[in-house]
């Protein structure tokens, strides 16, 4: 009979993991020493038998690698025991199986029997006095319910104990093939060294060892090990995320840095709306602080007529960062979104608002148009086009009875100079002021972060709402929004496209996911788009594909030779690269740039890891009936390169266990 004591088990697991870590350090040092001999140059070590000796040590390095992988599996296993026990609700339990199966089970039966006998005895008593004092017999329903719950808990505890025991034993056994392989493989290495007196490294036969049937299984063992370690890593991350999510439920947001780190670990998509808003505020503040000095100096050097307020930097990254970097910086800044938000605010504040909201809406709207969205276009541009003068004249005429209003909306030379002065002053504004502004954001809506949102220290105020044509003003805002949207992406010093700020991606229609940069078709940054087959793609702030999710379909799609030939050019494509399809055309994958990345030809073509993986998928889809093949592909990049360094792929065929592989973007994968 089993006895489960969580405290002892977890303590032993921690100790064993520590011992394996120490062993790993020793094995790494041994590997380093072996490799030191194997890598000796001919000038350092040559002569009769030198090549055999170096090959002998080189193959020992491979054996050491196998031991390190085996040790990593053991460490991952022992580190996961605490989480496995917690998943079953047994992290602090003490359980004697015999007590649950016998004593407690018997107690349950005995309790039922006792209650039944007592109820029968009471019934007899009540029957005897029924003619004198009729009484109802007490109900045993509550007792039965409580007893049933207790018995159910007993059974479930036994089930959890058995399941945990079986899971841990099964998982522990997963490393046994590695251990058996290492022993058998090492035996072959010894045999290749010679026999009897000739058993020395100088007689080592590397070819015999490397071509042995046992050694050829090395690749399969490595794949299994890699898959296991990846699963354990993901399990640990998921458990950490769940703990942090639980912690954030009642978090008081007092420590912004702590919250930010927890939220980054959890992932933006796993946060609540309130947490997402707070996370974005913190992230924008950090980006602003990091680039504060450079942005201010850059603005000063480029001319004092480029008016950009610091508050714009936080609330309107789509407008102000575009003016600085020349990039389409914020994904929600599309004409449809802006126009809809303008319409929404107009209906809310003008049509259905009160006196205050109408006056406020008109004041801010006029101020926005008068200054051509101060911080996005710049007062200098307004002065040159005469837009300010035209709008001012119209409103002055409409509000001729109000001298106060006329004075408030006049954009004079003094006003322009005042705004320019604010830019110079803004350069000196402290980070503390910016943080204070962020803390005042409160509950944001889409309207709050769009370009026409009020700039309290820049827009005119006091305009009488009843003297302005609100519909015309609304349409003017919408037209202006449309004008400022199309802006080219900038070019970095490395010749690549400049990135947009890091913001949550938004979904766009397929066909609207492309943009133009240097007369080339490129993907928009920070977006999610879906093909007609239902394949979903996500881009990062560089416009690179970072995720593809698909339930594959068998079929043929058109290839685009130009897209395949030019993927990653000119900076990032290597001579032996192909234009590799993330979702192959045999699965109806797009032949355009929205599905192609620079991919090493050896992994992409026949015999390569990527090719073989696709063949496995195609085979499953070709069966009758076809099996479901669900895949997720995540290209991982270094720096601002458009060429993935490697691909993390997770796929599931039918009811089989999910498989995770990592394929390096290099020969051999």
Curated annotation (Swiss-Prot):
Q: Where is the composition biased (Basic and acidic residues)?
A: 570-580
Instruction: Name a GO CC annotation attached to this entry.
Output: membrane raft
Which coarse location class describes where this protein primarily resides?
membrane
Q: What does induction of this protein depend on?
A: Expressed on rich and minimal solid media likely in early stationary phase; dependent on DegSU. Not expressed in liquid LB, but only under conditions that promote biofilm formation.
Give coiled-coil spans as residue ranges: 2-39, 100-171, 226-258
Give a GO molecular function annotation for the protein. Answer: DNA binding
Recorded hits in InterPro entries, A to Z, give:
Bact_secretion_toxin, DNA/RNA_non-sp_Endonuclease_sf, Endonuclea_NS_2, LXG_dom
Highest taxon of the source? Answer: Bacteria
Q: Where in the cell is it found?
A: Cell membrane; Membrane raft
Role noted for this protein: Toxic component of one of 6 LXG toxin-immunity modules in this strain. They promote kin selection, mediate competition in biofilms, and drive spatial segregation of different strains, indicating that LXG toxins may help avoid warfare between strains in biofilms. Mediates intercellular competition during biofilm formation; disruption of the operon disadvantages the bacteria, but overexpression of the cognate immunity protein restores growth in competition with wild-type.
Q: Which protein is depicted?
A: Toxin YeeF
Taxonomy of origin reads: Bacteria, Bacillati, Bacillota, Bacilli, Bacillales
Q: Tell me the name of the encoding gene.
A: yeeF
